């Protein structure tokens, strides 16, 4: 008999079973999933990086030669 793995919802902290019975995992609900998506869309969350790329017109995305 295996024990169910549980985690905390990253948005509200509610306990979530990690498995097929939790379709929004790691979130507890669609609401928490959408809250997280909104935070990314509003740039409240970001993936840290070494360089600071700006949105200026002179940034081409190409490495300097």
Curated annotation (Swiss-Prot):
Matching Pfam families? YacG
The record, for SUPFAM superfamilies, names:
Glucocorticoid receptor-like (DNA-binding domain) (SSF57716)
Keyword Metal-binding included in the entry's annotation: yes
Alphabetized UniProt keyword annotations: Metal-binding, Zinc
What processes in GO biological process is this protein linked to? regulation of DNA-templated transcription
- Residues of the signal peptide: none
Record keyword Cytoplasm present: no
Binding residues for Zn(2+): 9, 12, 28, 32
**Chain ranges passing through the membrane:** none
Q: Which InterPro entries match?
A: DNA_gyrase_inhibitor_YacG, Znf_NHR/GATA
> Which cofactor does the UniProt annotation name?
Zn(2+)
Q: Where is this region: Disordered?
A: 43-65
Which Gene3D superfamilies does this UniProt record tie to the protein?
A: Erythroid Transcription Factor GATA-1, subunit A (3.30.50.10)
Q: Which GO terms describe its molecular function?
A: DNA topoisomerase type II (double strand cut, ATP-hydrolyzing) inhibitor activity; zinc ion binding
Could you give the cofactor binding note from the entry? Answer: Binds 1 zinc ion.
**Purpose:** Inhibits all the catalytic activities of DNA gyrase by preventing its interaction with DNA. Acts by binding directly to the C-terminal domain of GyrB, which probably disrupts DNA binding by the gyrase.
The protein's assembly and partners: Interacts with GyrB.
Q: Which family does it belong to?
A: Belongs to the DNA gyrase inhibitor YacG family.
> What's the name of the protein?
DNA gyrase inhibitor YacG
Species this protein is from = Photorhabdus laumondii subsp. laumondii (strain DSM 15139 / CIP 105565 / TT01)
């Amino acid at each position: 008999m295996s024990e169910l793995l549980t985690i905390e919802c990253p948005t509200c902290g509610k306990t979530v079973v990690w498995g097929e019975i939790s379709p929004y995992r790691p979130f507890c609900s669609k609401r928490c999933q959408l809250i997280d998506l909104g935070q990314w869309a509003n740039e409240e969350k970001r993936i840290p990086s070494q360089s600071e790329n700006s949105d200026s017109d002179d940034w081409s995305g190409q490495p300097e030669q």
